[in-house]
Amino acid sequence: MPALSGPQYLGEGLKLIMRPGLRLFVLIPLTLNLLVFALLIGFAMQQFSHWVDLLMPSLPDWLSFLQYIVWPLFVLLVLVIVFFTFTMVANIISAPFNGFLSEKVEVVVRGRDDFPPFSWAELLAMIPRTMGREMRKLAYFLPRALVLLVLSFVPGVNLIATPLWILFGIWMMAVQYIDYPADNHKLGWNEMLAWLRSKRWACMGFGGVTYLALLIPLVNLVMMPAAVAGATLFWVREEGERALVK
């Protein structure tokens, strides 16, 4: 089943990033992500209770018992929003390194090198392209996230906001990471999305296990490069290059 093929790529990606030839491309973004994680978690811990209170609906006294049922949903909602923010910021900062990591993983998997050799000059040259692509992802993400955020404040409707955020998050994990190998091959944004939709169930399987792994504090720092490697395996084995010739 396609949905079951997705999760295995993350596990294989984790094994791949342990190879000596790939460690440089893992350690640099890992260090940057650690700094982002520390800053964001410190801020989130200070504001967490306030955010939950802000999102919680105001219930009449006779329904006050429902707070014990509804409160965990809004705690989960805040955690999901914090997770999205960290993932978005960390991936923007690490984008050029993630692009190079994806290239090198593809070299290992295919057994041939069709990419320019690594150099700091080449890395600098990649920054405008990778940052442009990250901004395109942001433009895709923000309007949809804004709709979900508005729903989170609508009494009654906000009860379904958490599962909708989770489903959207799973899809975005597939978009975020599989885009690295797609962008390396100069596949256009709309073409990339169309290809992902054609592999929807496999994408949701990969995105789902990646989403869960990235929710675990500290473990998520290692799983981000593993997700890049796993997404590259996804691209190769699901024959992403076929999308280039359409």
UniProtKB/Swiss-Prot annotation:
Which positions, given as ranges, span the membrane?
A: 24-44, 69-89, 148-168, 214-234
Q: Which GO terms describe its molecular function?
A: high-affinity sulfate:proton symporter activity
Keyword Magnesium tagged: no
* Protease keyword on record: no
**GO CC terms of this entry:** plasma membrane
Query: Which keywords, in A-to-Z order, does the entry hold?
Result: Amino-acid biosynthesis, Cell inner membrane, Cell membrane, Cysteine biosynthesis, Membrane, Sulfate transport, Transmembrane, Transmembrane helix, Transport
- Cite a single GO BP annotation: sulfate assimilation
> Organism's domain of life?
Bacteria
> What subcellular compartments does it reside in?
Cell inner membrane
Kindly give the membrane topology term recorded for this protein: Multi-pass membrane protein
| Annotated signal peptide | none
Protein family membership: Belongs to the CysZ family.
Function as written in the Swiss-Prot or TrEMBL entry: High affinity, high specificity proton-dependent sulfate transporter, which mediates sulfate uptake. Provides the sulfur source for the cysteine synthesis pathway.
**This protein is called what?**
Sulfate transporter CysZ
Gene encoding the protein: cysZ
